[in-house]
Amino acid sequence: MSEPLPPRLQEIVDTFVDAPADLRLDVLLDYAKAFPKLPEAYVGRTDLERVEECQSPLFLATELDAEGRVHIVVDAPVEAPTTRGFASILFHGVDGETAETIVALPDDLPTRFGLMELVSPLRLRGFSALLGRVKRQVRELVA
């Protein structure tokens, strides 16, 4: 049995899995359109970590608030809808969760969306790398 996911993230996975295969890319594009706006405090900054494994430029930072909740900051060009879609999924699925919850996310998460036949292995590897970077940054925040 698969490891359980936080409720919002599970809901996103279910949306993909419940959609017919030929509509899953449309769902991914919907998430790309819902890509979070870069917070004003990050505009022009150059200290976001680049996720090199992504085919398109993707930059990442994580923050821990006073209540111990993690906030994810991502930036990617509008011309990179797949990359933006994957980053948006993580943002909408886990932003505001505890560090413990995020670090416990399963490494196989990118395979749970039913996209294996629809996007290239390189794109899925980028999603895996993004997840790995988020988890590593969060571990560093709480160390």
Q: What feature does the model see in each segment?
A:
Residues 2-44:
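Extended low-complexity intrinsically disordered regions
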Residues 18-21, 77-82, 122:
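Structural motif
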Residues 53-57, 67-71, 84-86:
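Short connector loops at helix/strand junctions that flank enzyme active sites
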Residues 86-100:
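Alpha-helical support elements that line or immediately flank enzyme active sites
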Residues 100, 105, 109-143:
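C-terminal binding/interaction regions
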